[in-house]
Amino acid sequence: IDLTSPDTTVALLELDAVIGLRGTVEAVNGRKTLTRVGVTCALCHSTVDDSFAPGIGKRLDGWPNRDLNPGAIIALSPALDAGTRSVFNSWGKGKYDPRFNLDGINGPQVIPPAYGLAGVARITTTGDGDEIAYWNRYVAVTQMGGHGSFSDSRTGVDVRNGTDDLVTSRLPALQAYQLTLAAPTPPAGS
């Protein structure tokens, strides 16, 4: 299998075999074509155990994807000026700045795990919210452009995308799932 072929990528997306990406594949002029793509939380908060080959294996939900370089991906946008592109490229693998698009201050942090959070107070990496749902809403609306709203007078953030709300109804189930993700057993001697 040629993993560098766009046709392979389309086939994997059609099979829902790419962690963190969801695609709609349709026949266009007799050829399978990716007509829509979306990003899920798993892009940053799941990885694989490399049991088959590097980057291929059993899915590990809640584990931070420290191989992912979100800044380099975002920097590919033709809408960015050179200075902003440079900031995104400075982050490196496994890091992300969830506030940069709002405050313009370059402050990347290591992508945190989404496991072992049951019973943790001030559960978000920034300490802003008490529940994971706070952060899930923040990321869904302010980072991923999800249809809904996020507002916090303490931080001055008030973002509304669209007139419908496709975020709120999904938050309870997502939070419940995240709270079931136990932290892995530490390696011996660590």
Language-model regions: role of each:
Residues 1-190:
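Periplasmic c-type cytochrome electron-transfer domains
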